[in-house]
């Protein structure tokens, strides 16, 4: 690629010699500009792959810039991301790596990641898991998010089982299905329902939405592992790799 640009530069220089008798930095006149435009046009037609390479380089540059910007935001929002008391936490509370998931209980991709997360929890006891409720898919998602956060509020030791059951639900999320899962996981439906109405629950959901917006998270699932942001569903192998990379930093 450099050779091509060098060839283009040499060709341009040679073409401009008749028009540039002095080394003074003077603006191109109309005739010179036209000559350059024709030269570039003809060269790019003969070597269109240069445009593809330039587009790829631009995309890579923008991706790297976005990643760097998000990392700065993560550093600035560290406390809000990792240490909100209303946010459920599982695994080793003093773990050497923190894995944060933004999720919606109705999200099919979130459900598809559940087995990988369950396996990771079983095989690696040094991870701190942070669960960020971001209901995006309508009233049922909001209802489920309230239930999850309320379970954490009234019985944190029973949250994880309830969360897994709710995420693994194959049928539609309704108030009846949510309360039935609560009963099965040792939660008092009345206490849960009362806690769901607590204004602090909706406030926590609003904070999560604001946080997701700040981090430019527009869909679920999304993960933050250490300092790495990962949008979309990931498999167990990818999660293991991300954890290993976070530990290696």
Language-model regions, residue ranges each:
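N-terminal targeting signals for export/organelle localization
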Residues: 2, 19-78
């Amino acid at each position: 690629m450099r050779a091509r640009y060098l060839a283009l530069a040499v060709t341009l220089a040679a073409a401009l010699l008749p028009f540039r008798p002095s080394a003074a930095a003077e603006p191109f006149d109309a005739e010179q500009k036209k000559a350059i435009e024709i030269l570039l046009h003809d060269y790019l037609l003969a070597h269109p792959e240069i445009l593809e390479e330039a587009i790829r380089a631009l995309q890579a540059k923008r991706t790297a810039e976005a990643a760097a910007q998000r990392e700065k935001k993560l550093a600035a929002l560290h406390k809000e991301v990792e240490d909100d008391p209303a946010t459920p936490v599982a695994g080793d509370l003093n773990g050497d790596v923190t894995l944060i998931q933004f999720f919606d209980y109705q999200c099919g991709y979130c459900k598809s990641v559940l087995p990988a997360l369950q396996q990771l929890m079983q095989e690696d006891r040094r991870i701190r898991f942070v669960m960020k409720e971001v209901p995006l898919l309508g009233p049922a998602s909001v209802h489920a998010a309230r239930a999850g956060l309320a379970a954490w509020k009234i019985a944190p030791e029973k949250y994880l089982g309830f969360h897994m059951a709710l995420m693994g639900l194959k049928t539609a999320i309704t108030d009846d299905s949510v309360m039935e899962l609560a009963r099965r996981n040792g939660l008092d439906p009345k206490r849960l329902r009362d806690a769901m109405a607590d204004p602090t629950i909706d406030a926590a959901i609003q904070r999560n939405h604001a946080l997701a917006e700040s981090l430019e998270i527009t869909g679920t699932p999304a993960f933050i592992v250490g300092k790495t942001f990962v949008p979309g569903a990931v498999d167990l192998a990818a999660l293991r790799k991300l954890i290993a990379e976070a530990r290696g930093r």
